[in-house]
């Protein structure tokens, strides 16, 4: 049969060359249309495994500009010199669910930034909360599974979440925030993000400071009359579209970079463990009675360019908290130490062993200063296996978050959080509900009472024969 005209031939393979293609697909001795075979084989392999967490996401390019001199605490080339600019790419994401899920799910939100510095890539891998559910990395798989779909029904099941929380009280602090208005979707443009972990900024002489840095949205969380902006339930990609369209029309979102600083000699005196990821560095809101760790603004991140090809420019991005540059070192935080292995290992599975064509090398700056026996004793205590067990601070931080909400936001803000918790608790069996109430009794008797009364009222209402709805196993988490 006659070949197709070259100008009608699809571009095949990596060469991009056009050539005549025979229209016959098979002959008596088998397939001969190698171009069709090549196209089919490429199609079969064009997708890659989705991320184990943070599968649903979007991204954009931008730049970071230094806005303040922090050379007294910092020896990082990218941050030295007011006005210095660095190009970057940012990826936003939800955490627990799959790639096709909604932007508006009640979930942690991720904001990862890769800075293309003159000394290599520096990744800030952040969440929209300054703390996390766990401090023991061995619990991470169980924690994530508790937030995902029921393995039997493939529906979201709040009972799995509450089973985990009641057995791991360090998760109470995070659980309260997740069920408040902070846990619902704003937009990616109004999302603030926190690295959560302590890092070390190391000076040329080997001295260092513990630091926690974060990006505060210049638009702020878009609370209106104490509530969050509602996501269109018919548009699961609401935030993705909002970010893309804003950048296209020149309405560039921006964030102010801030850093909190702790001298290692002061760390044992703060009244809480700065290496415990279930606790935040107090900016002055809560807990009362603990030292405030003020922040210093030092830069501005602006996103000003959309990607052209999502798959190659965003889906294939590989972030890791181990991607550091000279002047930055990881702290002894156990979760951080585990993430520094888990992230690159996940990329090797998802993208292959050669996803880093030219592995980056950084010069180590050893922390050599002798900080004395008090610091060494504190460090050995707060990184010991015993510290992973429940203790009073796990309840204290959750308690003070609950109590500060009317003052920090509004009474209605606190009431909505309680209502969301009740709706999530109510579908569970009686034994699990009782365990939840007993757990919250250790946080606040008032909160436990409100949860018991609210959740049991929902249970009673749904048990009525004429109730329009009944609690179903695995129903959507509210």
UniProtKB/Swiss-Prot annotation:
GO terms for cellular component: mitochondrion; peroxisome. Keywords: Alkaloid metabolism, Heme, Hydrogen peroxide, Iron, Metal-binding, Oxidoreductase, Peroxidase. Pathway: Alkaloid biosynthesis; ergot alkaloid biosynthesis. InterPro entries: Catalase, Catalase_AS, Catalase_clade1/3, Catalase_core, Catalase_haem_BS, Catalase_sf. It is an enzyme of class 1 (oxidoreductase). GO terms for biological process: hydrogen peroxide catabolic process; indole alkaloid biosynthetic process; response to hydrogen peroxide. GO terms for molecular function: catalase activity; heme binding; metal ion binding. Its EC number is 1.11.-.-. Heme binds at residue 343. Residues 459-478 are annotated as: Disordered. The active site is at 54. Its cofactor is heme. Coiled coil: none annotated. Belongs to the catalase family. Catalase; part of the gene cluster that mediates the biosynthesis of fungal ergot alkaloid. DmaW catalyzes the first step of ergot alkaloid biosynthesis by condensing dimethylallyl diphosphate (DMAP) and tryptophan to form 4-dimethylallyl-L-tryptophan. The second step is catalyzed by the methyltransferase easF that methylates 4-dimethylallyl-L-tryptophan in the presence of S-adenosyl-L-methionine, resulting in the formation of 4-dimethylallyl-L-abrine. This is Catalase easC. It comes from Trichophyton verrucosum (strain HKI 0517). The gene is easC.
